[in-house]
Amino acid sequence: MQPGGQPDMSALLAQAQQMQQQLMAAQQEMAEAEVTGQAGGGLVTATVKGTGEVVGLKIDPKVVDPDDVETLQDLVIGAIEDASNKAQEIAAQKLGPLAGGFGGGGLPGLPGF
């Protein structure tokens, strides 16, 4: 604080720049992170990036039944949802503390922030 109770603008600016750098680093980490989710006890696994992009899908041949496509569809959706939930948890861990530094207003465009 400067005399008269005024905040030191240069200190506030430096703090904002530091927070911006931390946020950018965390966002880059999330963009590069890959998380795997599974369904059916591992019969179907899905890999998503921290951004939510699905980058991999593995299906055990045992679960492929032409007469029961609906079960396979449910397992694929379940695996993708599991991976997406894990990615959101990681994002909350990495970005959540930074969001608090923005006055509690959250981060626009990021779910849960």
From Swiss-Prot:
Pfam families: YbaB_DNA_bd
GO cellular component: bacterial nucleoid; cytosol
SUPFAM superfamilies according to UniProt: YbaB-like
Superkingdom: Bacteria
Keyword DNA-binding: yes
Signal sequence region: none
Keywords: Cytoplasm, DNA-binding
Cell location: Cytoplasm, Nucleoid
Broad class of where this protein is predominantly found: cytoplasm
GO molecular function terms attached to this record: DNA binding
Subunit structure: Homodimer.
Family of the protein in this entry: Belongs to the YbaB/EbfC family.
Function field: Binds to DNA and alters its conformation. May be involved in regulation of gene expression, nucleoid organization and DNA protection.
Protein name in the entry: Nucleoid-associated protein RHA1_ro04210
